[in-house]
From Swiss-Prot:
GO terms for molecular function: ATP binding; glutamate-cysteine ligase activity; metal ion binding. Pfam families: Glu_cys_ligase. GO terms for cellular component: cytosol. Signal peptide: none annotated. The lineage of its organism: Bacteria, Pseudomonadati, Pseudomonadota, Gammaproteobacteria, Enterobacterales. It catalyses: L-cysteine + L-glutamate + ATP = gamma-L-glutamyl-L-cysteine + ADP + phosphate + H(+). This is Glutamate--cysteine ligase.
């Protein structure tokens, strides 16, 4: 089932310098909660500066949903320590509040009023909040309080020079973009390995179902918890953050222009369903527009091609201008075993897997075939640890045992690990292979199995509260290592000044900005 990568691996072993200088970044979301686990109703803490313009600390959907961002980094330990410093400083600013350590929220009542993230009075700030109002009216607020980790990854220019013969980013943008699209197609085919190993949302609180009927064969505990015994990541299931209306958009990952055209079509195509919501009620805006996507960011995807945007530029225009610069991997649940929601083992695994995705052959995929890859993901998400579970290839009927496919994949990953270890010294990447390979013989070693044991005993709420308390104490007591308190104070003040500048420079009415998004 795994493509034959032997030639590409032999090439890599002859050109180890092609992997010198991999760049990464991390984003981690977490809900602010009270000591009893309920959602915090306070505003974004002033000590954390402006959520609109702060470089490292912002908010996602809700005012209580923090998002931490590291700068681009070539050093894994440095990046994780930076992320930990942001957590340490934030933990000291939250008073009695905690950071929820799980992807799925628990103590949110159906119909509870969840305050949307606020970004000030500028047009761009108001548009961000209105976009969230649209998400709430389209999908419900509860779905938007789910948290995850995003891992951003780029291969060094040396890789593309050696592999494709390009000279630089500008002249080589078509070849580099084609290479990243190959990675994305392989990710759709084999990325289910991420929820298998690291999925950590095998259960949900009953409030999450909001009384809606479900066909999933949930088992129920006495404390209002529903779980599937072999599930890995309900966050990635239809109960979590997905969007059924997007499944037939026909967006494909074969070619940059084709991908962008599909995206632009979706933000210009009216939706009958969303038109029913309306654009305004009693003078209050309800969504940016009633198209299938209000803006490009609304496209739900487990992985995205990205380029840093310039001011006033949409993500797709940035891609057309400069090609794909990096890839954003979006399938990681919050790691409940780490105070910062992610650890070095996961980052090293993702390095290995994304390099493999860039090396393995990946035929072009139609939109139908993309939908077929979803079958494997759904199996792994809902019953990934089930003994004897099998997976298919694309739309073909042949089935292969997940455990065997996983072991075959790790045989390749070990060779990538040897190359990366030869560059960095030590055995860190090979050690990750040893640790994770064991999960295919014993699914009880996976994140989902480990956290489910605790949840069955303590409930989701009990597990979440205990971890939140432990990490709060731990982070508050640890000294800062890379950033200083002065750095955080300076960025707080600078971010507030930047927001005021944006607000002062607004020259057009908000309605004119909205008209451009119609």
């Amino acid at each position: 089932m795994i493509p034959d990568v032997s030639q590409a691996l032999a090439w890599l072993e002859k050109h180890p310098q092609a992997l010198q200088g991999i760049q990464r970044g991390l984003e981690r979301e977490t809900l602010r909660v009270n000591a009893d686990g309920t959602l915090a109703t306070t505003g974004h803490p002033p000590a954390l500066g402006s959520a609109l313009t702060h470089k490292w600390i912002t908010t996602d959907f809700a005012e209580a949903l923090l998002e931490f961002i590291t700068p681009v980094d070539g050093d894994i330990e440095h990046m994780l320590t930076f992320m930990r410093d942001v957590h340490r400083y934030t933990a000291r600013q939250l008073g009695d509040e905690r950071m929820w350590p799980l992807s799925m929220p628990c103590y949110i009542a159906p119909g509870q009023d969840i305050e949307l993230a606020q970004y000030g009075t500028s047009n761009v700030g108001r548009l961000k909040t209105l976009y969230r109002e649209g998400l709430k009216n389209r999908y419900g607020a509860l779905m938007q309080t789910i948290s995850g980790v995003h891992y951003n990854f780029s291969l060094p220019m040396a890789f593309w020079q050696a592999k494709c013969g390009v000279e630089d980013a500008e002249s080589g943008k078509e070849a580099i973009s084609a290479g990243y699209f190959r990675s994305i197609r392989n990710y759709y085919r084999f990325g289910w390995v991420i929820p298998y190993l690291f999925g950590a949302s095998p259960a949900i609180c009953s409030s999450f179902l909001q009384g809606k009927p479900t066909t999933l064969p949930f088992e129920e505990t006495g404390n209002g918890m529903y779980y599937l015994p072999y599930a890995t990541s309900l966050r990635l299931s239809d109960l979590g953050y997905t969007n059924k209306s997007q499944s037939n958009l026909g967006i494909t990952f074969n070619d940059l222009h084709e991908y962008v055209a599909g995206l632009k079509r979706a933000i210009k195509t009216p939706s009958e369903e969303y038109a029913k919501i309306g654009l305004q009620k009693d003078g209050k805006y309800l969504q940016i527009n009633s198209n299938i996507l209000q803006i490009e960011n609304e496209l739900y995807a487990p992985i995205r091609p990205k380029r840093v945007t310039r001011r006033g530029e949409t993500p797709s225009d940035a891609l057309l201008r400069g090609g794909i610069e990096y890839i954003e991997v979006r399938s990681l649940d919050i790691n409940p075993f780490s105070p910062i929601g992610v650890d070095a083992q996961q980052v090293r695994f993702l390095d290995l897997f994304m390099v493999w995705c860039a090396l393995a052959d990946a035929p072009e995929m139609s939109s139908d075939e993309l939908l077929c890859t979803r079958t494997n993901w759904n199996r792994v998400i809902l019953e990934g640890r089930k003994p004897g579970l099998t997976l298919g290839i694309g739309c073909e009927s042949a089935q292969f045992p997940l455990a065997q496919v996983g072991k075959d994949l790790f045989r390749d990953l070990r060779r990538v690990a040897q190359t990366l270890d030869s560059i960095h010294g030590g055995q860190a990447y090979q050690q990750v292979c040893d640790e994770l390979l064991a999960c295919f013989d014993d699914p009880e070693l996976t994140f989902s199995a480990r956290i489910l044991r605790s949840m069955i005993e303590e409930g989701i709420g009990g597990t979440g509260r205990a971890l939140a308390d432990r990490y709060r104490t731990q982070l508050r007591e640890e000294p800062l290592e890379i950033l200083s308190e002065d750095d955080f104070i300076a960025e707080r003040d600078a971010s507030v000044a930047r927001q005021k500048k944006v607000e002062a420079e607004d020259s057009e009415p908000f309605e004119a900005l909205l008209a451009r998004h119609a």
